[in-house]
Amino acid sequence: MAALSLKGVRKSYDGKQHVLHGIDVEIADGEFIVLVGPSGCGKSTLLRMIAGLETVTDGEIAIGERVVNTLEPKDRDIAMVFQNYALYPHMTVAQNMGYGLKIRGIERTTIDSRVAAAAKILELEPLLARRPRELSGGQRQRVAMGRAIVREPSVFLFDEPLSNLDAKLRVQMRLEIQRLHARLATTSVYVTHDQIEAMTLAQRVIVMNRGYAEQIGAPVDVYEKPATVFVAGFIGSPAMNLMHGRLSDDGATFTVAGGGPALPVAGAPGIGAAIATGRDWVLGVRPEHMTPQPGVAQATLPVDSCELLGADNLAHGRWGNHDVAVRLPHADRPARGTALAAALPAHRLHFFDPETGKRAG
């Protein structure tokens, strides 16, 4: 195992326009980091640079005490798990897991021992004699993880490994990856566009956007205190409600743009200090914090639709020209046209600068 250090890492393909802009992060020995963001944000490019599959334009990547910028992938002491399982169809599970060690000249007894140990961890022992065509998608992905485990690397790199699996298998594999990391405690970098994977697997997440690391932090911190409008809108399902508007001179109300109502916001932390009154802001509040509750400031939301999500419901309406969603208990399913008393708890309100996108307060 080893720590992983990224200092000022940049990537450009033409020498002019950068696709990664000065990524700085120190990943502790044994830490599980998730790179999350939309397509084209640079997360997979960054992972490939760590792996040695892409060159580093500027900056430094170090694994342990070694700067690896110019090292070949085979010399970096890493193991990768890909979206595509990349299993040899003519080989058995055991042969697929041990093949990488075989071509490196590792002794047969060592290979057999490592394959047996990995198979036990991943519950693949009954499948060792089977070939890939005889396995389910989840089993194939476990074989791919087993192939990485037997290498006993300093760093695991996961490139959207669950993307090809159905929803039920993804849940199962998330749990298996959690258990695997708890057992091996190997430094891991995991790339995904799926925020549920990011929130459930990561010790820290790096939210990527247009080649920048928008925010780095523990999942709960990123969720509860998003640093930018982008993070606020990207992390969370359903997404945070974000509304442009103007904060009154006395800081008591926020008038939603597009003819929306004046929302009661008095008491929100930072108003009158970091959050200047009498100016435009972007107001954010999560749907689950707007569930009607006694003793909390409220505003009426005309309901135009309601989604049944199973354990709860999601009521939709509009304030001005902004769509607004409110999470409700399973038994509370308002009809179209209902006037819903949406809660606006002061300590759950977020204010963002409309020009910079950065959080205030």
Curated annotation (Swiss-Prot):
> What is the top EC class of this enzyme, as a single word?
translocase
Q: Which GO terms describe its molecular function?
A: ABC-type glycerol-3-phosphate transporter activity; ATP binding; ATP hydrolysis activity
Explain the purpose of this protein: Part of the ABC transporter complex UgpBAEC involved in sn-glycerol-3-phosphate (G3P) import. Responsible for energy coupling to the transport system.
Q: Which CDD domains match?
A: ABC_MalK_N (cd03301)
- E.C. no: 7.6.2.10
> Which locations, inside or outside the cell, does it occupy?
Cell inner membrane
List the GO biological process terms. carbohydrate transport; glycerophosphodiester transmembrane transport
How does this polypeptide assemble, per the annotation? The complex is composed of two ATP-binding proteins (UgpC), two transmembrane proteins (UgpA and UgpE) and a solute-binding protein (UgpB).
One family name in Pfam for this protein: ABC_tran
Alphabetized SMART domains for the sequence: AAA
As its record notes, the protein acts as a catalyst of:
sn-glycerol 3-phosphate(out) + ATP + H2O = sn-glycerol 3-phosphate(in) + ADP + phosphate + H(+)
The root-end lineage is:
Bacteria, Pseudomonadati, Pseudomonadota, Betaproteobacteria, Burkholderiales
Task: Tell me which GO cellular component terms the UniProt record holds.
Answer: ATP-binding cassette (ABC) transporter complex, substrate-binding subunit-containing
Its membrane topology: Peripheral membrane protein
Q: Which UniProt keywords apply?
A: ATP-binding, Cell inner membrane, Cell membrane, Membrane, Nucleotide-binding, Sugar transport, Translocase, Transport
**Residue ranges constituting the ABC transporter domain according to the UniProt record:** 4-235
Lineage, top-rank taxon, reads Bacteria
Positions annotated to bind ATP: 37-44
Q: Which family does it belong to?
A: Belongs to the ABC transporter superfamily. sn-glycerol-3-phosphate importer (TC 3.A.1.1.3) family.
Record's InterPro entries?
AAA+_ATPase, ABC_transporter-like_ATP-bd, ABC_transporter-like_CS, ABC_transpr_MalK-like, ABC_transpr_MalK/UgpC-like, Mo/tungstate-bd_C_term_dom, NA-bd_OB-fold, OB_MalK-like
Q: What is this protein called?
A: sn-glycerol-3-phosphate import ATP-binding protein UgpC
Task: Answer whether the UniProt record assigns the keyword Translocase to this protein.
Answer: yes
First-listed, main subcellular location of the protein, grouped into a coarse class:
membrane
